[in-house]
Amino acid sequence: MKQAKKQGVLERFYYSSDEIIEKPFNWAQMWRLLSYVKPYRKTILPLSFLTVLIGTAVKLVIPILIGVYVLDQAITGRNSELLIQLIFIISGLYVLNYAANVLRIRWMNQLGQHVIYDLRQHLFTHVQRLSHRFFDQRSAGSILVRIMNDINSLQELFTSGVINLLTDLLLLAGVIIILFTLSPELTIAIMVTLPIMFFISTSLRKKIRRSWQTVRLKQSKLNSHLNESIQGIRVTQAFTQEEENMAYFDGVNQENYESWREATRKNAMFRPLVEMTNAIGTAVLIWYGATLIMNETITIGVFVSFAFYLGMFWEPISRLGQVYNQLLMGMASSERIFEFLDEQPNVKEKPNAIHNEKINGEISFEEVEFSYDEKRKALHAVSFSIPAGSTLALVGHTGSGKTTIANLISRFYDAAGGTIKIDGIPIKDLSLASLRSQISIVLQDTFIFSGTIMENIRFGRPNASDEEVMKASQAVGADEFISDLAEGYATEVEERGSVLSAGQRQLISFARALLADPAIIILDEATASIDTETEVKIQQALKTLLKGRTAVMIAHRLSTIRDADRIIVLDHGRKIEEGNHDQLLAKGGIYAGLVKAQYSTAIE
């Protein structure tokens, strides 16, 4: 098999621990999956079961009518009246069976669609509530695979697999009872083939299950690569890495193809082996059945009925193999789905959390420590306070802990040590909704959703009027370029706002944040993507709009934080300097050096 060529950033497409799930098949997990059928136990489910019972009963009756009554009584006894009656009865039963099958398929499809809808809704809702650490450890592609592909793979299991399993088990039980009733000796003779069937099933079961697990893993890897390749197409083309990317994709695609081929090859082995076992059973039936007829132990009609039932015996067994494969595929997917559903948020809200309708915005950090992993601390006993309505700027090299502080204020992560307070209340005591609803964040990498510009600005406050949206846009200088667009605020923008410039996207994010009317605004290098002319426009707007609000500014351009009430310089997670712009310049420390370096670069 061709292996995916790994190089550069593509090496990140590995099988992380959350992708490798090796749990044995167990009924507890199946019952958990079937719990999603529970809401329909009084509606669609009983109707489906009724059609199963009717269809199974009809199938079991027809061979007896044909063999014992048509052959042994009507034809052998030359009773034409009985023959005509039996023909009408059998024809009516076939029509009834057809109607039962149509209704069963219809209702089971409805049930399957309901269950898939509920399961996908449950999974998506759960993922929405997980903490940022969960998303740090997984690619967007692998998450999409769980929500889309893995749940889709359960659709056939719910629409046909489970009901077919029930149908086949009922049919098998009925056939075995009737076979022993017709001829215990002949039944026992035929049953000698069952050990062969058992051996085939047990030997293939584990191999087939592992094959479908591999298929799911390869699909996840393929989807992850596709997702990132599409999102990063501009970077790929800018660095002329198309050939390398295509070569890597060819390897990943080949691995996916090989995994499917191996799984289907093992699946394909099952049915022919069942048919071979069926042939052996048929040979036993003909040989021993003929002997019993000649000895007048059974009649020809019983023999014919027996032949019908033998076919009905092996047919569900053959299908059980197929249903079992569906179960294996479903288990492989459900394990991955439940692995997500069992994931608990790292950031949890207390049962009696305080819900503050309005906060003033005073923020304090008291000996706060934090680390993203065990290897390196991101913050070392950081302490500071921000009076309500004032502006704090965070400065430092990449990895100094600036964004970490912003994330902790919004409680996207919980501090490993120390206490963070807002208005004197530990943020762990506040409800997440009341905390985050009063904080607006503007990031350097602005995310624009598919929809209109109006809808994007209104995202954080859905009930805002059009006038309020326009007022917020005017305040940050976004109204000027929006009004120049053909459709204005009704202009449709694609995912991530690709038709807009970086500066325009940033202005929309400013308007979005300000429309929410927060007590606290966090600007995470929010002006880094804005040109100098646009920056001048928004600086004046920010002075007005930040008045009366607490602001935390993470600065890349130090010129944007001159007017900050206080500046903290961070280095490797430690607070090194603190003061306003003039004080830090006079100190001649790290901040003064950064300002001098940026000024020199600007002159050059």
From Swiss-Prot:
<keyword id="KW-0472">Membrane</keyword>
<dbReference type="Pfam" id="PF00664">
    <property type="entry name" value="ABC_membrane"/>
</dbReference>
<feature type="transmembrane region" description="Helical">
    <location>
        <begin position="297"/>
        <end position="317"/>
    </location>
</feature>
<feature type="transmembrane region" description="Helical">
    <location>
        <begin position="49"/>
        <end position="69"/>
    </location>
</feature>
<protein>
    <recommendedName>
        <fullName>Uncharacterized ABC transporter ATP-binding protein YknV</fullName>
    </recommendedName>
</protein>
<comment type="similarity">
    <text>Belongs to the ABC transporter superfamily.</text>
</comment>
<dbReference type="GO" id="GO:0005524">
    <property type="term" value="F:ATP binding"/>
</dbReference>
<keyword id="KW-0547">Nucleotide-binding</keyword>
<dbReference type="InterPro" id="IPR003439">
    <property type="entry name" value="ABC_transporter-like_ATP-bd"/>
</dbReference>
<dbReference type="GO" id="GO:0005886">
    <property type="term" value="C:plasma membrane"/>
</dbReference>
<feature type="transmembrane region" description="Helical">
    <location>
        <begin position="82"/>
        <end position="102"/>
    </location>
</feature>
<feature type="transmembrane region" description="Helical">
    <location>
        <begin position="162"/>
        <end position="182"/>
    </location>
</feature>
<feature type="transmembrane region" description="Helical">
    <location>
        <begin position="184"/>
        <end position="204"/>
    </location>
</feature>
<feature type="domain" description="ABC transporter">
    <location>
        <begin position="363"/>
        <end position="597"/>
    </location>
</feature>
<dbReference type="GO" id="GO:0055085">
    <property type="term" value="P:transmembrane transport"/>
</dbReference>
<keyword id="KW-0067">ATP-binding</keyword>
<dbReference type="GO" id="GO:0034040">
    <property type="term" value="F:ATPase-coupled lipid transmembrane transporter activity"/>
</dbReference>
<dbReference type="Pfam" id="PF00005">
    <property type="entry name" value="ABC_tran"/>
</dbReference>
<keyword id="KW-0812">Transmembrane</keyword>
<dbReference type="InterPro" id="IPR036640">
    <property type="entry name" value="ABC1_TM_sf"/>
</dbReference>
<dbReference type="InterPro" id="IPR011527">
    <property type="entry name" value="ABC1_TM_dom"/>
</dbReference>
<dbReference type="InterPro" id="IPR003593">
    <property type="entry name" value="AAA+_ATPase"/>
</dbReference>
<dbReference type="GO" id="GO:0140359">
    <property type="term" value="F:ABC-type transporter activity"/>
</dbReference>
<dbReference type="GO" id="GO:0016887">
    <property type="term" value="F:ATP hydrolysis activity"/>
</dbReference>
<dbReference type="InterPro" id="IPR039421">
    <property type="entry name" value="Type_1_exporter"/>
</dbReference>
<dbReference type="InterPro" id="IPR017871">
    <property type="entry name" value="ABC_transporter-like_CS"/>
</dbReference>
<keyword id="KW-0813">Transport</keyword>
<dbReference type="InterPro" id="IPR027417">
    <property type="entry name" value="P-loop_NTPase"/>
</dbReference>
<keyword id="KW-1003">Cell membrane</keyword>
<keyword id="KW-1133">Transmembrane helix</keyword>
<feature type="domain" description="ABC transmembrane type-1">
    <location>
        <begin position="45"/>
        <end position="329"/>
    </location>
</feature>
<feature type="binding site">
    <location>
        <begin position="396"/>
        <end position="403"/>
    </location>
    <ligand>
        <name>ATP</name>
    </ligand>
</feature>
<feature type="transmembrane region" description="Helical">
    <location>
        <begin position="273"/>
        <end position="293"/>
    </location>
</feature>
